[in-house]
């Protein structure tokens, strides 16, 4: 961990009233089902919301308490932290929390108990660390290029952090790479520091499945909770154009995620789906203890050889979990009732309180 020490978090947790725990999160990303799931398991809920963005949470009535801030990043301010601690809050991280609060602040300044592994958030954000987790687990991944001058076939170019696909692009040569970098910088999507940390990997042609898992530290078991695919702008609109028109216009499609839709995968591929998750969980335990505690996502492509290839991970609840707020076919198979990712998180916290094992799932 950074300057936030585990023993200090445990001391705060020891002073909490375990009969009155509040589940809290930042008002964005996946907060609707995080809070609704907490309510379904009997918890009070709280949301830290940027001024002017509270309407969805009021309309859906998912929060018992509101902490309104000028900017999302204010969640790390001491007065906000104290309000959370006074509520006996356990904070659930998600992509927007990481992006707005900032990893340095989460590691060094945010002295509020968090569900899951605080340390692993940096491992998903930094491409080399993310890749190390996959390599250690011997998970099938795309080939990586160390320098744009080596590009000799179609590649996907990505950048650090939780961006929702913004700035990603495909290139087939060093010249095309440089041209598209210049265009992205002109749009204000990239800075020189981003370019220096560009992640270049082979473009895998296949169907996209974002696979959502939950690792229970209490039961030492990986659960498959759901899958989704993405609506991405502008590539989804671009591919609906006739081929002639695509060739005639000078457009570089972007891959900005604008929404998600649920998916199921061919049943014969499920052994690969479980195996790759089990491998990743074990490598995470080894490289960044206590590992992938709670929700995580493996973003994959399935090629025409029916190989499931992982190109990215999320080490916390992923935006695609919004597709199964009322449960998915896979969570139904496990639980026989509606089970969202938010509810599964709350259930883990509830079980940990009963077993007096909160320290296993909190950092």
Curated annotation (Swiss-Prot):
Pathway: Purine metabolism; IMP biosynthesis via de novo pathway; 5-formamido-1-(5-phospho-D-ribosyl)imidazole-4-carboxamide from 5-amino-1-(5-phospho-D-ribosyl)imidazole-4-carboxamide (formate route): step 1/1. The keyword Disulfide bond does not apply. Pfam families: DUF1246, DUF1297. ATP binds at residues 148-210, 232. InterPro entries: ATP-grasp (IPR011761), ATP_grasp_subdomain_1 (IPR013815), IMP_biosynth_PurP (IPR023656), IMP_biosynth_PurP_C (IPR009720), IMP_biosynth_PurP_N (IPR010672), PreATP-grasp_dom_sf (IPR016185). The keyword Cell wall biogenesis/degradation does not apply. One of its GO terms (biological process) is 'de novo' IMP biosynthetic process. Mg(2+) binds at residues 299, 312. PROSITE patterns: ATP_GRASP. Its EC number is 6.3.4.23. Keywords: ATP-binding, Ligase, Magnesium, Manganese, Metal-binding, Nucleotide-binding, Purine biosynthesis. Residues 118-354 form the ATP-grasp domain. Binds 1 Mg(2+) or Mn(2+) ion per subunit. Its cofactor is Mg(2+); Mn(2+). One of its GO terms (molecular function) is ligase activity, forming carbon-nitrogen bonds. 5-amino-1-(5-phospho-beta-D-ribosyl)imidazole-4-carboxamide binds at residues 29, 96, 260. It catalyses: 5-amino-1-(5-phospho-beta-D-ribosyl)imidazole-4-carboxamide + formate + ATP = 5-formamido-1-(5-phospho-D-ribosyl)imidazole-4-carboxamide + ADP + phosphate. It is an enzyme of class 6 (ligase). PANTHER family: 5-FORMAMINOIMIDAZOLE-4-CARBOXAMIDE-1-(BETA)-D-RIBOFURANOSYL 5'-MONOPHOSPHATE SYNTHETASE, 5-FORMAMINOIMIDAZOLE-4-CARBOXAMIDE-1-(BETA)-D-RIBOFURANOSYL 5'-MONOPHOSPHATE SYNTHETASE-RELATED. Belongs to the phosphohexose mutase family. Catalyzes the ATP- and formate-dependent formylation of 5-aminoimidazole-4-carboxamide-1-beta-d-ribofuranosyl 5'-monophosphate (AICAR) to 5-formaminoimidazole-4-carboxamide-1-beta-d-ribofuranosyl 5'-monophosphate (FAICAR) in the absence of folates. This is 5-formaminoimidazole-4-carboxamide-1-(beta)-D-ribofuranosyl 5'-monophosphate synthetase. It comes from Methanobrevibacter smithii (strain ATCC 35061 / DSM 861 / OCM 144 / PS). The gene is purP.
């Amino acid at each position: 961990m950074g300057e936030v020490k585990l023993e200090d978090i445990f001391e705060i947790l020891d002073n909490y009233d375990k009969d009155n725990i509040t589940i809290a999160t930042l008002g964005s990303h996946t907060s609707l089902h995080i809070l609704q799931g907490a309510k379904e398991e009997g918890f009070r809920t709280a949301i830290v919301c940027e001024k002017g963005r509270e309407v969805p949470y009021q309309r859906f009535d998912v929060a018992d308490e509101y902490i309104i801030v000028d900017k999302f990043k204010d969640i790390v301010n001491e007065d906000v932290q104290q309000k959370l601690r006074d509520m006996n809050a356990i904070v659930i991280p998600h992509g927007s929390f990481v992006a707005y609060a900032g990893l340095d602040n989460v590691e060094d300044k945010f002295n509020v108990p968090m569900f899951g592994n605080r340390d692993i958030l940096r491992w998903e954000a930094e491409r080399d660390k993310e890749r190390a987790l996959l390599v250690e687990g011997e998970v099938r991944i795309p080939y990586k290029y160390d320098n744009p001058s080596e590009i000799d076939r179609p590649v996907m170019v990505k950048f650090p952090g939780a961006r929702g696909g913004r700035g990603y692009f495909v290139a087939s040569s060093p010249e095309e790479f440089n041209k598209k970098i210049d265009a992205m910088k002109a749009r204000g999507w990239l800075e020189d520091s981003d370019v220096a940390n560009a992640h270049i990997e082979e473009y895998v042609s296949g169907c996209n499945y974002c696979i959502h898992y939950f690792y229970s530290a209490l039961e030492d078991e990986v659960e498959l909770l759901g899958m989704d695919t993405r609506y991405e702008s502008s590539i989804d609109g671009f591919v609906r154009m006739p081929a002639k028109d695509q060739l005639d216009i000078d457009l570089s499609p972007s891959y900005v995620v604008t929404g998600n839709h649920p998916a199921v995968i061919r049943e014969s591929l499920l052994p690969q789906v479980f195996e790759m998750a089990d491998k990743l969980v074990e490598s995470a335990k080894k490289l960044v203890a206590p590992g992938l505690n709670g929700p995580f996502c493996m973003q994959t492509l399935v090629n025409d050889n029916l190989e499931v290839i992982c190109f990215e991970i999320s080490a916390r609840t992923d935006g695609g979990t919004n597709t199964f707020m009322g449960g998915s076919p896979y969570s139904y198979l496990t639980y026989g009732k509606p089970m969202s990712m938010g509810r599964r998180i709350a259930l883990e916290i509830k079980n940990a309180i009963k077993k007096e094992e909160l320290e296993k799932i909190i950092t």
